[in-house]
Structure formats: structure tokens, C-alpha cells
């Protein structure tokens, strides 16, 4: 088992246990699990602190309507493996699709990840 596999297994185990926050590739992420949490996502926020994000479960497509800042989206499969990354998604983008394999998305403030 590689270190990436171990990290992914830890993520999946934390999600199955009902964790409200998890670590994904060094990012501390709030987990949006319920319908209302997933629908709201990052709406109403002016940004995120560096090293933080939101992990939206049961999601393979996002929008940035009503967002106040650009985001980076990292789409993950059920095992926690990255299937697609989209950087610099501006507010008011109507449709960003992660692909058929995506089951969750990690949203990050792209103003904090520009140098990475």
C-alpha cells in the first residue's frame, strides 16, 4: 500500500464514520454532507483561510453562482483519488462537471492556491 493509498483509506474511513471535518492532501476541509449543507456550499463567504476548504459529498458537478471569490475544484472518486482538477473558476460560472467517476469535490479559495 502506498502512502497515497493510506491517505485515501483514512479519508474514506473518516467520511464513513460521519466526520464533520477531514484532511485531504494537507487541506483541512469542512464536510458538507446534508442536502442543505451541499446546496449552500461556500455561498455567503468572502473567502477561506489558507490551508482550508470544503468537501462536498455526493457531488460531481458544481456552480459558482452568488460566489464572492474564485475557487479551485478538485473532484474525487469514491476512494478519494483525484479524477479532475479545475483551477480559477470565477464567480457566476453555471456548470463545472467533474466527470462520471467523481463523487465528491474539494473546493478551495483559488487566491490562496495560486502559487501552488
Where are these regions (language model features)?
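Compact, glycine-rich, soluble single-domain proteins
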Residues: 2-116
Amino acid at each position: 500500500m502506498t502512502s497515497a493509498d493510506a491517505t485515501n483509506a483514512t479519508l474514506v474511513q473518516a467520511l464513513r464514520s460521519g466526520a464533520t471535518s477531514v484532511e485531504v492532501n494537507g487541506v483541512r476541509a469542512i464536510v458538507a454532507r446534508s442536502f442543505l449543507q451541499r446546496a449552500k456550499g461556500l455561498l455567503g463567504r468572502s473567502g477561506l483561510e489558507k490551508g482550508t476548504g470544503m468537501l462536498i459529498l455526493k457531488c460531481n458537478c458544481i456552480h459558482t453562482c452568488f460566489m464572492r471569490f474564485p475557487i479551485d475544484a478538485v473532484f474525487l472518486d469514491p476512494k478519494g483519488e483525484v479524477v479532475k482538477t479545475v483551477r480559477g473558476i470565477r464567480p457566476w460560472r453555471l456548470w463545472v462537471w467533474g466527470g462520471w467517476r467523481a463523487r465528491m469535490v474539494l473546493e478551495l479559495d483559488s487566491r490562496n492556491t495560486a502559487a501552488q
